[in-house]
Structures are given as structure tokens and as C-alpha cells.
Amino acid sequence: MEDLFIQGTDSLPTVSLKTTGELKIAGRALPEDAVKFFVPILDWITGFSAEEINIEINLDYFNTSVSKQLLDFFKIIEQNRANKVVNLKWMYEDGDEEMLESGELYQELVPGFHFTFHKFAE
């Protein structure tokens, strides 16, 4: 298995999935077709296993269809984790309560992950 890297654009996030267990999604997520955009990401994560997984989500905005794909991403990891440690660092801009609430919702939906929330200045 090789690392997966997708360069972000103004409307697509940068995605870095490393076999070391470091998984990052950052930027703005407004793809025209979220399902199509996430196909290689979900395919990669389906075959992935590591002793410890560290996820960092640092999105300044994502739409509803991306929200569903993120949940699928998390659920696949949760199903494959086999009692391994999964840390999820949810980044949000100071004052962006919607992004914080989105992270808190995911925390409820994937209770097996160790969530931390990190606020950063505008």
C-alpha cells in the first residue's frame, strides 16, 4: 500500500493519507460530486491498517454531501480499527461555532475515537 495525496484547490481539500497512520484532510470542501471525490479516499482507507491512527481534520467549510462522506470515512476506520487507538484532532477557527458543533456531532457518531478540539486564531 502506498500513501495517497490529493492536492487541494479553492473548492477541494488537500488530502494526505500516509501508511504511517497520519491522515489529514484540510481546506475547503465543496466538490461538485462528493461521492466521486471520496472514492479513492474510501478505497484507500478500506484496505488500511496501522497500530495507531492519527487523523487531523482542518476544514474551513464543507457542504452536506461532504459531511456524509466524512462520516463514511470515519465509520470505515472505526470498523477496521480492531481495538487500535484512533486519535482525531478537529481544527476550527476561533468563533466558528458551526465547525466546532460539526466536530462534536462526529464525536457522538464515532465514540471509539479519541477526539480533541483545537481552536486557532483567524
In which residue ranges do the predicted regions lie?
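STAS-typified acidic loop motif
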Residues: 2-39
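Amphipathic alpha-helical interaction surfaces in cytosolic regulatory modules
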Residues: 38-42, 57-107
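Acidic, aromatic-enriched beta-alpha/helix-loop junctions
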Residues: 42-52, 56
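Short proline/glycine- and acidic-rich turn/helix-capping motifs at secondary-structure junctions
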Residues: 60, 120-122
